[in-house]
Amino acid sequence: TTLEPIVSKEGSAAVILKYWDRKYHRTADLVVIEGPKAGGHLGFSREQLEEYAEYDDKEYTEKSYDDEVKKIMAVVRKYSEKYGCSIPVVLAGGIYDRAAAKHAFSLGVDGIQVATRFVTTEECDADIRYKEAYIRANKEDIQIVKSPVGMPGRAIMNPFMERVMAGERISPKKCLLCMKGCKPSEIPYCITESLLHAAKGETDEALLFCGADAWRAEKIETV
């Protein structure tokens, strides 16, 4: 089993690697740094995400996170040296084109993780209606949303999420016991049910996770 933590901040990387080092005398095999433009659940507070979102300039957003990336890499390097091994670092979040990939590698990372760009491809096995939701989305449709897991997420606004953001509670049809500590009678909606709707292409009832650049998709392409 490999240890591959996903972190967004220097503090998170330091705590995780220190814990594994002290308790298990092990370190990570790989570290993924997920930036503020990623899709799905995000390792930032809503306030931090809104601060990044205040700037529409893509270059600014990238550079404003560069210092954090370098700090995380320094933490990883410390444990790489201690254990005498290579710990590859992969950068994710907002890497949509060649320029973004080039910028990521200029920071010294070993690899990149790309998701949103590949959703609207023939090779992606997502339901066609899910892909079409990306293609139809405008920049303004992509918002930071509520999630039952207690973390902010990035998704496409649709009838389902409009109800949630308006304060409506959508009761789970059946509790699947998917999350420890979850209280079905209190959560705004069931994360599993909403993601299953997305997988089935039932986009009006789904949580449509996406990266910040999903609106840039114009058509179904091929890899």
Which residues does each predicted region cover?
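Charged, low-complexity, helix/coiled-coil-prone segments
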Residues: 2-12, 169-178
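Active-site glycine- and acidic-residue-rich loops that bind
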Residues: 4-21, 95
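Structural recognition of alpha->loop->beta junctions
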Residues: 20-31, 108
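Conserved active-site-proximal phosphate/metal-binding subdomains
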Residues: 28, 38-90, 96-223
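Catalytic beta/alpha-barrel core
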Residues: 1-9, 32-34, 61
